[in-house]
């Protein structure tokens, strides 16, 4: 096999690969054996005709497709390895020469991983944000705990709807005098003042009593997300079925004992403050790492192939689809609710995808230049963490082995990138 390489443009190369005629003839014979049973030739039982008879009857190229596939699948990876290329997409194959008794010559045009030009990535300056825990922060946590443990009780007979009440309602909506999809519900639980419903819908229920009905008039936002409703005035027929109210528990030592391991409210507050401080430290660390990485990436020069960005967007869409699935939705529903489309979402994701790809390439460059590697022990430790998340149980060791076997390269790359980030942070300078 002979190969030639031509650089078409940045990150695109064309390989011309010559497969010797002997190899190509072997591939044709292999294709004959694979397909002979498909051919009917007069004078021969089906599947028994010799190769030369079949080619005479059906034409010289009858076995070329399979032979080409065989040769390309064998020769292309060898050429890639010979020229030390890192393809990021499937090659575009074109036939240059093919025929009986001839060498098989083809070209493979392929997009390769781009070269990153990066200098002076040590000692970058980045802003370090700091966050203090205030008494208000602790109070918010306590209030959330009180809300979570609140009792929902029915208000006394004759009481009217007030802000923060929970109104159980039936409603039916109309736009242009016609009921619309999703505009009707029975026994809907609506907390007044949360802004769950559009416009001033909730405010118009204040003062109503059980059994009373009201016509509520609102306007849908211009960007509501449904073309047939955007900016339209709407009328809702609403009936109050029941009025409930949250009864918060007393914030005392008994409450602290019920919801935590602590005997007093003061001890509970101290614990909440400690946890908030830990969360803030982690936030500061993550934000500083991101600031350092962003500064390093700004110093890097790299021309990212469009296909790498598109593949990253594909992954982001799959992640979105998975998260929507947890909510019982799919992408089609998401596009409808957000008045969008796949093309619009892909365009919206493009900037983030490009940033993620560039970060990956920059970290890869630093890993290579600094000779950073993940040890076997680190890979196994990460696999153990994953096994625990999967709930390995008694077969944890086997699960760890399976994870290492299937994802060794991925884990090694993740760990090396994490070490590269640590390296950049350790060699950076904090600025206020």
UniProtKB/Swiss-Prot annotation:
PROSITE patterns: FKBP_PPIASE. Its EC number is 5.2.1.8. Keywords: Cell cycle, Cell division, Chaperone, Cytoplasm, Isomerase, Rotamase. Gene3D superfamilies: 3.10.50.40, Trigger factor ribosome-binding domain, Trigger factor, C-terminal domain. Residues 164-249 form the PPIase FKBP-type domain. It catalyses: [protein]-peptidylproline (omega=180) = [protein]-peptidylproline (omega=0). Coiled coil: none annotated. Its main location: cytoplasm. GO terms for cellular component: cytoplasm. GO terms for biological process: 'de novo' cotranslational protein folding; cell division; chaperone-mediated protein folding; protein transport; protein unfolding. The keyword Nuclease does not apply. It is found in: Cytoplasm. It holds the Pfam family Trigger_N. GO terms for molecular function: peptidyl-prolyl cis-trans isomerase activity; protein folding chaperone; ribosome binding. Consists of 3 domains; the N-terminus binds the ribosome, the middle domain has PPIase activity, while the C-terminus has intrinsic chaperone activity on its own. Belongs to the FKBP-type PPIase family. Tig subfamily. Involved in protein export. Acts as a chaperone by maintaining the newly synthesized protein in an open conformation. Functions as a peptidyl-prolyl cis-trans isomerase. HAMAP family: Trigger_factor_Tig. This is Trigger factor. It comes from Clostridium novyi (strain NT). The gene is tig.
């Amino acid at each position: 096999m002979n190969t030639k390489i031509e650089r078409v443009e940045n990150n695109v190369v064309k390989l011309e690969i010559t497969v010797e005629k002997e190899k190509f003839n072997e591939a044709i014979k292999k294709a004959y054996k694979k397909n002979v049973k498909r051919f009917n030739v007069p004078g021969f039982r089906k599947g028994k005709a010799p190769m030369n008879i079949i080619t005479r009857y059906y034409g010289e190229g009858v076995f070329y497709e399979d032979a080409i596939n065989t040769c390309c699948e064998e020769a292309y990876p060898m050429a890639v390895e010979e020229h030390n290329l890192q393809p990021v997409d499937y090659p575009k194959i074109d036939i240059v020469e093919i025929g009986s008794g001839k060498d098989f010559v083809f070209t493979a045009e392929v997009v390769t991983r781009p070269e990153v030009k990066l200098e002076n990535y040590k000692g970058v300056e980045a802003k370090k944000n700091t966050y203090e825990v205030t008494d208000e922060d602790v109070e918010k946590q306590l209030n959330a705990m009180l809300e979570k443990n609140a009792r929902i009780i029915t208000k006394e007979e004759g009481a009217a709807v007030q802000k923060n009440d929970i109104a159980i309602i039936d409603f039916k909506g109309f736009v242009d005098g016609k009921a619309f999809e999703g505009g009707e519900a029975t026994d809907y639980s609506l907390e007044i003042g949360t802004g769950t419903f559009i416009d001033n819908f909730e405010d118009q229920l204040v003062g109503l009593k059980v059994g009373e009905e009201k016509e509520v008039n609102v306007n849908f936002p211009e960007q509501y997300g449904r073309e047939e409703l955007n900016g339209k005035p709407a009328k809702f027929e609403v009936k109050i079925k029941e009025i409930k109210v949250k009864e918060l528990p007393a914030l005392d030592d008994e409450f602290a004992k019920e919801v935590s391991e602590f005997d007093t409210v003061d001890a509970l507050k101290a614990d909440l403050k400690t946890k908030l401080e830990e969360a803030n430290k982690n936030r500061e660390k993550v934000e500083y790492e991101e600031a350092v990485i962003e500064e390093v990436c700004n110093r890097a020069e790299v021309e990212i192939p469009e296909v790498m960005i598109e593949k990253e967007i594909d992954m982001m869409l799959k992640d979105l689809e998975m998260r929507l699935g947890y909510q019982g939705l799919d992408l089609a529903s998401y596009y409808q609710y957000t008045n969008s489309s796949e093309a619009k979402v892909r365009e919206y994701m493009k900037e983030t995808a490009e940033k993620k790809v560039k970060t990956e390439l920059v970290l890869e460059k630093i890993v290579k230049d600094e000779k950073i590697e993940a040890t076997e022990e680190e890979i196994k430790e990460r696999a153990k963490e994953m096994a625990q998340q999967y709930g390995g149980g008694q077969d944890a060791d086997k699960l760890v082995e399976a994870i290492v076997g299937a994802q060794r390269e991925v884990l090694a790359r993740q760990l090396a990138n994490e070490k590269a980030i640590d390296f950049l942070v350790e060699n950076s300078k904090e600025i206020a």
